Amino acid sequence: FALKVPAKYTGRFCRLFAVYWLFTASVAYLLVAVCAAFADLHGGTLYGLMQYAPVGILPALLPFLLMGANALTGVFEGYRNCNFVKRAGQVFERSGVIRIGVVGSYGKTSVKNILKTLLSEKYSVIATPESYNAPMGIAKTVLSNECEGKQIFIAEMGARKKGDIKELCDLVKPDYAIFTGVCEQHIATFGSLENIWAEKSEILKCGAKKVVCGSSLKTWLQETDDRVLVLDEGADAQFGAMATAFTLRLYGENVPVKT
């Protein structure tokens, strides 16, 4: 058994563990006290054995105690997270950095990494690390020391429920965006492919100067404006271990590209 990401004892974990421990200790003490009171009041072997009942009852209550501790600390964590994200938005506004959002059901991390590599040849670029694609992950990247002095910020933007992309757009306010495509990823939370499209397509309404869309989105994009660019599938792309060659078609022009 191996964790994808090594466990870290973050502040949130420590706060949750402390409240969980207090809940467990309090309930255990209460159960022991009640059972002991019954034993003293009524006497007898049966009531004497009741003193040991908490030993069998408490393990069954542990999941519910954890849920209760999480609900209690969640009030504080929600307030703290909201302020953290708000502060990141303020830093965004002051920085003047060019912001690029990457949205889609698949390929976000790969596109983000490729784009960062390409742009880094000319600009100072930072991208959200690994698969950070939620408000807290983006905010953490914005408020990190590595973000200072950067010219371009690339944000991977994910969604598991309705409203997630709108929330991320309000935070990032992308100047440019890439929309890779839609598929049945997270259909368990969205319910249908149409709902997934409706959520992901919020990136088209974010006010970006240009939104580059994958070729698979042609069937979804009924009406577009000049801001939306839909890419064609490359028929002559050649991939090798040391080089890549393809023809880039933009606005009716063909540009041969080799790497």
Language model: regions and residue ranges:
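A generic structural signal for short, solvent-exposed coil/turn residues
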Residues: 11, 94, 117-119, 238-240, ...
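Transmembrane alpha-helical segments that serve as helix-helix packing and pore/cofactor-lining elements
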Residues: 2-22, 38-42
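A polyampholytic, Gly/Pro-enriched intrinsically disordered region
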Residues: 102, 148-151, 248-255
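ATP-dependent carboxylate-amine ligase catalytic core
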Residues: 1, 34-48, 52-60, 64, ...
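Acidic, Mg2+-coordinating active-site environments of NTP-dependent enzymes
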Residues: 179-259
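Canonical alpha-helical transmembrane segments of integral membrane proteins
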Residues: 20-35
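Glycine-rich phosphate-binding P-loop
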Residues: 99-119
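Cofactor-binding loop segments of dinucleotide-utilizing enzymes, especially the Rossmann-like FAD-
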Residues: 105, 130, 214
